[in-house]
Structures are given as C-alpha cells and as structure tokens.
Amino acid sequence: MKPRIWTFELRKGSQVLEHFSCTCPDCHRKGDALATRIGSVDCYAYNEPLNRWQKMGTYRGHYMFTDGFGKERRIKDDYSGMATMRKEVTV
C-alpha cells in the first residue's frame, strides 16, 4: 500500500515558512528540524473535503543537552529548567 501524500504548511504566527507535500513522518522530520533552528512552529495540513487548512500541532524542537554523566536531557522551551529526555511525538 502506498503512503498517503498530504499538503502541509509550517507557520510562525501568520508567516508561512514552508509549504510542501509529503507523508506524515517526513513532515515530522521537517517540522522538528525547522523548530530546532528557529523556535516553535505551527503545522497546518490542507483538508481537501472541507477545502481549508487545519492546525495539526506545534513543533517545539529538540533543545537537547547531554550532562557530564552522559545523560541526555531536554531544555524546556521557556528555558525554566531541565527535563529528562524521552522519545515522544509533539504533534
């Protein structure tokens, strides 16, 4: 079975940063990479039956940190502290 191709936009506020068509896992990679570089970005997908854009979620980036003992941590988005790194999807 062929994976479904969707049309996505990554936005920061009302500004469109990227517009592309791909599968959902590819969108996760692009959104995470962009959010890691410039901060949180919103992901919108085009809903063809409704003929409109729908917000799918917000990518916040990785903000990873490895401490002196080799433990991976994630800096919180507001830089208020540290959290232990977990594998998770933010969308």
Summary of predicted features, one role per range:
Residues 14-26:
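A short, exposed loop/beta-hairpin motif centered on an aromatic-Gly-Thr core
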Residues 23-42:
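A short, charged, amphipathic alpha-helix used as a generic interaction element across diverse proteins
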